[in-house]
Amino acid sequence: MRAANATTGAVRRLFLIATEESGDRLGAALMQALKTRLGDGVVFEGVGGRAMAEQGLVSLFPIEELSIMGISAVVRRLPSILRRIRSTADAVLGAKPDMLIIIDSPDFTHRVARRVRVRDPSIAIVNYVSPTVWAWRPGRARAMRRYVDHVLALLPFEPEEYRRLRGPPCTYVGHPLTEQIAHLRPSPAEQARRDAEPPVLVVLPGSRRSEIHHLMAVFGETLGRLQAEQGDLELILPTVPHLRDAVEAGVRDWPVQPRIVVGDADKKAAFRIARAAFAKSGTVTLELALAHVPMVAVYKAGAMEAWIGKRVIRSASVILANLVVGENVIPEFIQEDCVPDRLVPALREVLADTPMRARQLEGFGRIDDIMSTGAQTPSGRAADIVLNVLRKH
């Protein structure tokens, strides 16, 4: 076993792996929280992006190498991905850290973790962001006991799922979105705009090029028909800098033109005045729920992903906000249901003062208490558990 007490003055060596932008942000916040607690008594190595680099991490390779989505894309890149898994595991073993912290991206990070645990069991392993064992492949939870010492969960229902599935110890540390609530809730003037005419509809067709490819046509046709039936609408489409070109190309043939805004601040500003949202399923549904914006959510994948998904997904909903609230308050339209004939009536209903809209708002009103972490930030709670695992390992 390695030296176990973070208060002894020994320098802690931590190896972090985050291969997506969201994980990079989580990793950076965790690094900052650990530096607050340990000062110069911690050294970081690993894989990360821009945010973790700002905290001092020199990444083994650019995480953009792994920013792929979809089974067909993974198959094409499989040889290079497997090489990266092997080389990353070798780098961890060569660094001999006190702990390996794997952040999200389980198809990559868990393969690294398994290799490390087999070859050097003395390295503690913490998994930050639970794989979706509650949605599909529940057997992963029990298998993780062999190579994960603790899971840091972002969603409040996940620890109970790990207990039920006999997985490793799991603690809810909080979702980083809960730290943004003050920036998501409207001022009195913004609330007045929410209630004014024409209504603002926020349009969110996805955060990856593959998602935009699958959804832009159905979004455009749906919004054209909605405006023809509903009358005037103000459409705002938030995106990120590296997707702006794809979004602008995708809306060019739409019968109605949204106002495109770029960046997180403008996205939150749009949420604060939005009457409703039309969104691709994902983390953004939880962000909209925390902003108290009723929505219609959709998901449409490629043919192969859809075929597999129908056979393995076991959760009652694919919408994060529904899972957190504990009931399906947000209507979801998946694959063959993701068509204008179904979407237009749902959007009309969520824009109007209807029981469906009221039910969503009532559910969203409970989210603050459900997701609360008290006075401590999610990154602070995560850092404290990391240190506790180090003491015990």
Curated annotation (Swiss-Prot):
EC number assigned by the record: 2.4.1.182
GO cellular component terms given for this protein: membrane
Keywords: Glycosyltransferase, Lipid A biosynthesis, Lipid biosynthesis, Lipid metabolism, Transferase
Superkingdom of origin organism: Bacteria
Recorded metabolic or biological pathway in which this protein acts: Bacterial outer membrane biogenesis; LPS lipid A biosynthesis
Catalytically driven reaction(s): a lipid X + a UDP-2-N,3-O-bis[(3R)-3-hydroxyacyl]-alpha-D-glucosamine = a lipid A disaccharide + UDP + H(+)
A Pfam cross-reference name: LpxB
A Gene Ontology molecular function term of the record: phospholipid binding
InterPro entries: Glyco_trans_19
One GO biological process term: lipid A biosynthetic process
Enzyme class: transferase
HAMAP family: LpxB
Matches recorded under PANTHER family: LIPID-A-DISACCHARIDE SYNTHASE (PTHR30372), LIPID-A-DISACCHARIDE SYNTHASE, MITOCHONDRIAL-RELATED (PTHR30372:SF4)
Family according to the record: Belongs to the LpxB family.
Stated role: Condensation of UDP-2,3-diacylglucosamine and 2,3-diacylglucosamine-1-phosphate to form lipid A disaccharide, a precursor of lipid A, a phosphorylated glycolipid that anchors the lipopolysaccharide to the outer membrane of the cell.
The protein's name in its UniProt record: Lipid-A-disaccharide synthase
Primary gene name: lpxB
